[in-house]
């Protein structure tokens, strides 16, 4: 039984921004098996024995995914998911469920969990789900970063440039925009060029995409 007396939390990376697999399970045997599996494929991971312990550690948004037992004493999996939602934490969650927990897993999916896997499961099956969840998290973070960059560029536009931007993305020609704003067509052309430069857009299509992102 000695191998199961592992620390409830194990940190395998010194970089808090490295993608990490967070594992929360009250079963020591499961934690030990998960730890061995993560080590075998060199996945950064941290292991917790309870939802409360995990929340105490996760004081900020970090990249990675969460592998979470749906049934635990104290703070259960669904309750932990609810708390993360309240905190605005978008960490992708994979729920580990028993045979009779499918309705709970469906509820978790409806609330934003990316996947669930039933016990017993094959190691490769879990690893595949984890890699998919990590890819999902990376895509979300890239989208959030892009949104923040676009918002920053928009803030640098003058009021007039923003007016021109909002009209340009509707597909209206410079002549029509000039008429609607009560300025010359040449003025619109100048503002349009400045908008393209400040927004770092190479084409009208780029501007339209940024407008949709904003």
Predicted regions and their residues:
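Basic, Lys/Arg-enriched C-terminal extension of HTH/homeodomain DNA-binding domains
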Residues: 8, 193-214
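C-terminal output helix
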Residues: 101-103, 117, 121-130, 176, ...
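Active-site beta3 strand of CheY-like receiver
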Residues: 22, 61-67
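Acidic catalytic/metal-coordinating carboxylates
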Residues: 49-50, 75-80
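Receiver (REC) domain active-site loop signature in two-component systems and cognate sites
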Residues: 72
């Amino acid at each position: 039984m000695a191998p199961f007396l592992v620390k409830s939390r194990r940190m395998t990376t010194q970089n808090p921004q490295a993608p990490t697999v967070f594992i929360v399970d009250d079963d020591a045997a499961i934690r030990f098996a998960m730890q061995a599996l993560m080590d075998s494929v060199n996945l950064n991971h941290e292991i917790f024995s309870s939802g409360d312990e995990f929340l105490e550690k996760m004081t900020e948004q970090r990249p990675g995914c969460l592998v979470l037992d749906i049934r635990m004493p104290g703070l259960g999996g669904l309750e932990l998911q609810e708390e993360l939602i309240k905190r605005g934490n978008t960490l992708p969650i994979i729920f580990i469920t028993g045979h009779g927990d499918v309705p709970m897993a469906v509820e978790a999916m409806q609330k934003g969990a990316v996947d669930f896997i039933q016990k017993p499961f094959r190691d490769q099956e879990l690893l595949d789900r984890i890699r998919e969840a990590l890819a999902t998290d990376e895509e979300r973070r890239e989208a959030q970063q892009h949104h923040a960059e676009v918002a920053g560029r928009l803030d640098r536009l003058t009021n007039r440039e923003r007016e021109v931007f909002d009209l340009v993305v509707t597909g209206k020609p410079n002549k029509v925009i000039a008429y609607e704003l009560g300025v010359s067509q040449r003025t619109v052309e100048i503002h349009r060029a400045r908008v393209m430069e400040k927004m770092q857009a190479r084409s009208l299509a780029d501007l339209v995409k940024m407008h949709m992102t904003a």
